[in-house]
Amino acid sequence: MSFYDYSANSNDGKPKKLSAFKGKVLLVVNTASQCGFTPQYKGLQDLYAKYKDRGFAVLGFPCDQFGHQEPGSDDEIATFCETNYGVDFPLFSKIEVNGDNAHPVYKFLKSEKGGLLGDAIKWNFTKFLVDKQGNVVERYAPMTTPERIAGDIEKELER
């Protein structure tokens, strides 16, 4: 199995096969609009703008499991991201990343790259770098800023 074998609902509620991103380097992030890390949206958008023409995308998966910091509807989330951070990278419908109802995409990501203290996602803005073949190559903690990931993205784009 690879990342591209899964699907998820895009922010408009329509199913989207992740195979649509095959051949791209991806940064997959669980996001929230009312979190101390929310300003990372700017850095994520900057990475997307810088590298999208080279085969890179950021995929945002809003999640309300951590401190109820993503209470809005999918439409409200999209409006917030666009208005405040100019986000135009793909956003998906709100999901759960941990527990019995964790989305299959996140079950896969966590099984491929566990964290320091087990597989569970600990907070918003945990990031996974996925290579062009759909393999999870790195997992980053929430406090790792998008700017610090640029070098790893460059390496994957050059492979």
PLM segments and residue spans:
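Thiol-based oxidoreductase modules, predominantly thioredoxin-like and allied folds used
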Residues: 55-73, 88-99
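Short, internal strand/loop/helix patches
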Residues: 7, 75-123
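Preference for well-ordered, secondary-structure-rich cores of eukaryotic proteins
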Residues: 10-13, 85, 147
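Thiol-/selenol-based redox modules, centered on thioredoxin-like
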Residues: 107, 111-159
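Amphipathic alpha-helical repeat scaffolds
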Residues: 10, 30-34
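Conserved helix-turn-beta segment immediately C-terminal to the redox Cys motif
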Residues: 24-25, 34, 39-62, 81-85
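N-terminal "domain-start" segment that seeds a small globular fold
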Residues: 1-19, 104
